[in-house]
Amino acid sequence: MAVALGCAIQASLNQGSVFQEYDTDCEVFRQRFRQFQYREAAGPHEAFNKLWELCCQWLKPKMRSKEQILELLVLEQFLTILPTEIETWVREHCPENRERVVSLIEDLQRELDIPEQQVDMHDMLLEELAPVGTAHIPPTMHLESPALQVMGPAQEAPVAEAWIPQAGPPELNYSATGECQNFLDPGYPLPKLDMNFSLENREEPWVKELQDSKEMKQLLDSKIGFEIGIENEEDTSKQKKMETMYPFIVTLEGNALQGPILQKDYVQLENQWETPPEDLQRDLAKLVDQQNPTLGETPENSNLEEPLNPKPHKKKSPGEKPHRCPQCGKCFARKSQLTGHQRIHSGEEPHKCPECGKRFLRSSDLYRHQRLHTGERPYECTVCKKRFTRRSHLIGHQRTHSEEETYKCLECGKSFCHGSSLKRHLKTHTGEKPHRCHNCGKSFSRLTALTLHQRTHTEERPFKCNYCGKSFRQRPSLVIHLRIHTGEKPYKCTHCSKSFRQRAGLIMHQVTHFRGLI
């Protein structure tokens, strides 16, 4: 039933949507919101703001009511609890509301004539253990699935609500191929089953021992049947015994899988992570892939008396850095870190400022640069209330209040908070001016001073006011100019409480107070 459901849904997708699709921008914004990573932001403040922006783009609180936003959230959760095939089919049709989702699922059930409980749990377990493909069924085994009841009457299973292999009937007649085709035909080609079984080997000893073994019953009663909901009883002695007696189960394709080890690994995974059933299905499929031998290998071609020992899953150690740069040999823990590092060698700067066109290697660098245009200063000094664009600038400024000066000039004894400040100061003693202008030959001790000087030749004014359009060569000039529009006057006189936009204006004003004292 599960195979028929998956194939029918795929056939419906291939034929195209019969419903009118709506704008997919909402789904795009939802995926961006769910897939956003903390490492994409420069810090917690930026990460929170980015998540807020993505959430508003998805839910659109200014356009939607509270009830509509709540419906979107419930709709998203409802899609995640659907079976994987139905969820994929519904998302392809991009439903815009709950009525649309319910009608899509009801139409699909009526089209495929599927009951509301969808799929038998036994079939779902077999579907996860054996992907759709050319199946080879051992001659002495049959299933209690309705799609395969043409093979003969099924014997009553010794364990309730669990499927185990059963010995086949004495005689099987597969001459009525037409009846079988009518029963299984869903309107698209199905893989052809190999029905030419030899009845001489139906009493092979391993089959009888397998169906009578307590280990097989315990495996099928355990939490590996996650949708049946039978609790697994932890018994160390039985687990050890299971590893010594026929540690396998046989799928529809004839592949032997390690039952006890598969059960043990899956229970550990389930106890570690509390995930929804659809996520457990995907994790179970991964465990099966790790233990699955070569596809198409039948029990007759494999040695079933020897335990199947798959290669253990290799876990990364905490300090392991497997990704190495071929240019410089530097190693990284993540491939994304290596990709970002390789841009240094290639000179690639993918992040461009829309205001001035300057490019950057990292998105965090671009975000900090854009503060120059917006005037944003998120870091504030708690002592003097002065604000800064970078946290490092705030830390350096706070040293002026604590009188922490760790860098001292040996020539004049002057101390500085930063090593870079001491380095610039030393050039005043040596007279070093390494930065020279190619236009007029003038030299400067600092690169920033040369950059500002060159703008007098090029007449470049990169700092533009967003209010009036006036441009400036230096950013401090733009900051002072913006105070005209904002009305900010940060410099306050301590005598008369009068405020000024520039420090020079405050100094000139304070002279009037001192004149009276003289």
Curated annotation (Swiss-Prot):
SMART domains assigned: SCAN (SM00431), ZnF_C2H2 (SM00355)
ZnF locations on chain (C2H2-type): 323-345, 351-373, 379-401, 407-429, 435-457, 463-485, 491-513
Cited function: May be involved in transcriptional regulation.
Keywords: DNA-binding, Metal-binding, Nucleus, Repeat, Transcription, Transcription regulation, Zinc, Zinc-finger
Single biological process term from Gene Ontology: spermatogonial cell division
A Gene Ontology term for the protein's cellular component: nucleus
Keyword Lipoprotein: no
Keyword Signal: no
Biased composition (Polar residues): 292-304
CDD domains named among the record's database cross-references: FYVE_like_SF, SCAN
Compartments (UniProt record): Nucleus
Region (Disordered): 292-325
Gene that this polypeptide is encoded by: ZNF449
InterPro entries xref list: SCAN_dom, SCAN_sf, Znf_C2H2_sf, Znf_C2H2_type
Recorded family membership: Belongs to the krueppel C2H2-type zinc-finger protein family.
Source organism per UniProt: Pan paniscus
Gene Ontology MF terms: DNA-binding transcription factor activity, RNA polymerase II-specific; RNA polymerase II cis-regulatory region sequence-specific DNA binding; zinc ion binding
Protein name per its UniProtKB record: Zinc finger protein 449
Stretches assigned to the SCAN box domain: 30-112
